[in-house]
């Protein structure tokens, strides 16, 4: 997803009118071994794969590894109209967070204050109100920290119960593709 924001910034700055933005991920035992050692990969349902990744569920037992790539054509409105392109979405803005392991964060559970600040800044950068958000594509990985993610969203948006937007997790269907996850999920 960071590639989308980088492309957005270049187009908005007039340095490009159209860009191909996306990412890819690797796969293999050396990549996934560390995650397995941290006990965040699903292993309890190897005989029943449809139960393998269940974010926000009482039976959540880790995520399923995935790999792949995703890319989007991002362009200015003028460029899209000029070439009569089908417009699927509009990028309003966003925010990038880094340093999630500082101040109490870990590799598997980022610093909640930094995450909440990132969400708040993204909403402000998009010039929308939290109540305007219809759906959130969550990071949700079917680990014990899914609850923390929902709590961070709820606190950052100041929305609770029926006001809280729908939240989904495509990782439950395609696996966690690490660096490619955001791009693949945006394409989906």
Task: Mark where each language-model region is.
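Beta-strand segments within the central parallel beta-sheet cores of soluble alpha/beta enzyme folds
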Residues: 16-24, 86-94, 131-138, 163-171
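Conserved small-residue
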Residues: 7, 35, 73, 91, ...
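Condensing-enzyme catalytic core mediating Claisen C-C bond formation in acyl metabolism
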Residues: 46-128, 134-135
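Conserved catalytic cysteine-centered active-site region
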Residues: 1-5, 38-64, 152-184
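Acidic, glycine-rich active-site loops and adjacent beta-strand->loop/helix elements
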Residues: 1, 23-28, 93-98, 140-142, ...
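Short glycine/threonine-rich loop-to-helix capping motif typified by GTGT followed
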Residues: 101-112, 140-158, 177-184
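Active-site-proximal alpha-helical scaffold in enzymes
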Residues: 1-24, 64-85, 176-188
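Conserved beta-ketoacyl condensing-enzyme motif
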Residues: 18-32, 130-153
């Amino acid at each position: 997803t960071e590639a989308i924001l980088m492309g957005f910034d270049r187009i908005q700055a007039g340095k490009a009118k159209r860009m191909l933005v996306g990412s890819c991920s690797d796969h293999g035992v050396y990549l996934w071994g560390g995650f397995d050692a941290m006990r965040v990969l699903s292993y309890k349902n190897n005989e029943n794969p449809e139960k393998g990744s269940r974010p926000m569920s009482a039976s959540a037992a880790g995520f399923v590894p995935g790999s792949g790539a995703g890319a989007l054509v991002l362009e200015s409105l003028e460029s899209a109209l000029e070439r009569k392109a089908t417009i699927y979405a509009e990028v309003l803005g966003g925010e990038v967070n880094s340093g999630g392991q500082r101040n109490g964060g870990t590799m598997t559970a980022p610093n909640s204050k930094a995450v909440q600040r990132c969400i708040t800044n993204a909403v402000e950068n998009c010039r929308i109100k939290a109540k305007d958000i219809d759906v959130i594509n969550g990071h949700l990985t079917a680990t014990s920290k899914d609850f923390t993610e929902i709590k961070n969203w709820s606190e950052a948006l100041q929305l609770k119960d029926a006001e809280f937007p729908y939240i989904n997790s495509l990782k439950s269907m395609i696996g966690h593709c690490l660096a490619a996850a955001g791009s693949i999920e945006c394409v989906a």
